[in-house]
Amino acid sequence: DRFGFQNSVMVNSGSSANLVMVAALKKYFGWEDGDEIIVCACGFATTIAPIVQNGLKPIFVDITWNDLNWNMDQVEEKISERTRAVFSSPVLGNAYDMDRIVDLCDRNDLKLISDNCDSLGSKYKGDYLTKHAIAASCSFYPAHHLCTIEGGMVSSNIKEVVDLARSFAWWGRGCYCVGQQNLLPNGVCGRRFDKWLEGYDDIVDHKYVFGQMGYNLKPLDLQGAVGSIQLLRFDEIHKLRRRNKKAIH
């Protein structure tokens, strides 16, 4: 909620977050194999890999040396009739020209996706870099802003996108309730046999309906417990990281 998103799902790594986020966006928006996503040439491998793994095509844009982010003039040049999204991945938390990229996306009907693994908490003109993103990922690897030993998260204000991401991370299961929201006092799911899955008229056991070709990317309870404590220290950690950057930059 702090970063402007109402829906999130935790997974076992930032790389997994990117994988299920791209899969969810492709399915939700109906992108086709071979559709293009513009990415920065300087970044981590698992920003790029999920694009290819989901049958899409990465289109690379070179960087500018002052911030290691994409050359905005090249972004304009790389747009084609098959471009569907721009996938930002701010290097070392350096803010990019958000005004220009948002204008570019609006003019060309493109979605802005944010790989926030390096930039959790980074701002541009007072706004978090994820403000205009249709979906965003973050990583809880030890070297990043928050640590859950390993872990990641997908966030979006489109509930269906997060539901799909959760399904892809939970084996592709059609039943993806959050936490204990539908549990009875005895711990049994109170809606397990209800008629609430789209496309299924008969009463079925939702636990064994798999609508996607999914994965097993669930986090451990321990990771969530560590993360809940780390959240309390986020401002402190962020302040220390900014201090360290100023010392070496």
Feature locations, PLM:
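Phosphate-binding glycine-rich loop
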Residues: 1-36, 50-52, 60, 127
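Glycine-rich phosphate-binding loop at the start of an alpha helix
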Residues: 11, 15, 45, 69, ...
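Active-site region of PLP-dependent enzymes
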Residues: 119-125, 132-249
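PLP-dependent aminotransferase-like
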Residues: 26-107, 111-116, 123
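Structured loop/turn residues at beta-strand edges in well-structured enzyme cores
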Residues: 3, 32, 81, 130-131, ...
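Conserved SAM-binding loop
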Residues: 10, 39, 154
